[in-house]
């Protein structure tokens, strides 16, 4: 047992006659032992009187003016953690508070899942590094930086490689190097003709290509395979397509390497402000801007192009339209998965119309 307070440890039956009118004088070493918070309590004592409730007489004597009860200000053995108690379960993400509990429980080492290293290969003859003087036809590589930030946010360790030109042998060698050095490899396709053929051919020749194209939009051209028992994902070059492939395919993969499951996004019910058409062939993810009007959410679809980067920046959430559904009419209640907090959404002014820089300035001032 240990002391829960700074004070003195003593036998409670020696204090029963103490009161405001009858102060009792106790002697150190004979009646009590000075203790600090956390100190072990000798077996002959059964309570602790706080230092605030003592009157110091001299170095070896104190007065008490109220009685104490057994176990007063004492933390019994096992109050916090008992022997063989489970402190944290397996496949649990260690939080700062868990570290304290583990050490308090006498655990100084434990086995953990290794953070997966994720190799990121940007490809394309037209792709150039940020800061490069641009020529006609050049495209700045920003996808690989976005991927790196996402991988890090999800608990992985990103390893970004230099841009690889559209050449089978160059891509093959880059993939071989990345497979050797990482647990997962992401190949980000360029937009030039034949680009996907190089990626799929390399995966097929070095390992096995399981999937080339899925029925989601954006994100249709995704490729999935394995080389040397390591997952290889070919990610479309369009940024919105790339985002949803990362969210829907790569994120769960990175989490699985850590023994974790992805958490479901918060869902709110919102009324669609305008008609939203969809192809019958694909399960579609539609970015929306949310407003909170009259105690209800309203959702306005944003630009739906796969290359519309700002639609991701501006989106408060997204709705999903299943395959075989042609679209959703205005006024329909839909489920929206949130990308922004509800507090932010509820404090957003809703303006629907053509873009005006004044709106951006006002929004920045109000932010």
List where the protein language model places each region.
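Phosphate-interaction motifs
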Residues: 1-108, 269, 285, 321, ...
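Flexible glycine/proline-rich
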Residues: 3, 81, 204-351, 359
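Short coil/turn connectors at secondary-structure junctions
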Residues: 5, 29-31, 43-46, 51, ...
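Short glycine-rich anion-binding loops that position phosphate/pyrophosphate groups of nucleotides
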Residues: 39-40, 125-126, 190-196, 237
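Short glycine-rich, flexible loops that bind phosphorylated cofactors or substrates
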Residues: 42, 96, 193-195, 343
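Phosphate-binding glycine-rich loops and their immediate beta-loop-alpha structural context
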Residues: 79-187, 348-367
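Short Gly/Thr/Asp-enriched flexible loops that form oxyanion-binding sites at enzyme active sites
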Residues: 194-206
């Amino acid at each position: 047992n240990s002391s829960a307070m700074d004070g003195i440890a003593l036998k409670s039956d020696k204090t029963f006659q103490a009161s405001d009118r009858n102060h009792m004088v106790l002697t150190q070493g004979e009646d009590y032992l000075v203790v600090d918070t956390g100190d072990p309590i000798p077996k002959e004592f059964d309570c602790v009187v706080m230092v605030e409730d003592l009157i110091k007489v001299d170095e070896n004597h104190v007065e008490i003016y109220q009685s104490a009860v057994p176990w007063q200000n004492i933390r019994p053995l096992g109050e916090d953690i008992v022997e063989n108690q489970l402190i944290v379960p397996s496949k649990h993400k260690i939080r700062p508070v868990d570290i304290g509990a583990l050490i308090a429980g006498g655990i100084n080492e434990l086995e953990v899942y290794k953070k997966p290293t994720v190799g990121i290969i940007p490809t394309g003859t037209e792709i150039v590094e940020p800061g490069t003087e641009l020529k006609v036809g050049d495209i700045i590589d920003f996808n690989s930086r976005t991927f790196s930030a996402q991988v890090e946010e999800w608990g992985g360790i990103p390893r970004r490689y230099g841009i690889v030109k559209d050449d089978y042998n160059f891509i093959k060698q880059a993939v071989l190097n990345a497979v050797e050095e990482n647990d997962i490899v992401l190949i980000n396709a360029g937009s030039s003709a034949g680009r996907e053929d190089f990626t799929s051919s390399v995966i097929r020749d070095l390992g096995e290509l399981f999937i080339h194209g899925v029925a989601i939009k954006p994100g249709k051209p995704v490729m999935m395979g394995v080389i040397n028992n390591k997952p290889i994902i070919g990610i479309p070059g369009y940024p919105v397509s790339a985002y949803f492939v990362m969210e829907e395919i790569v994120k769960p993969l990175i989490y699985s390497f850590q023994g974790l499951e992805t958490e479901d996004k918060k869902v709110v019910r919102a009324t669609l402000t305008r008609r939203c058409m969809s192809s019958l062939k694909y399960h579609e993810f539609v970015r929306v801007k949310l407003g909170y009007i009259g105690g209800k959410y309203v959702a306005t679809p944003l630009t739906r192009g796969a290359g519309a980067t700002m639609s991701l920046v501006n989106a408060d959430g997204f709705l999903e339209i299943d395959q075989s559904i042609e679209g959703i009419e205005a006024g329909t209640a839909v489920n929206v998965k949130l990308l922004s907090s509800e507090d932010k959404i509820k404090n957003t002014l809703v303006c629907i119309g053509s873009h005006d820089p004044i709106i951006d300035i006002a929004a920045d001032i109000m932010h």
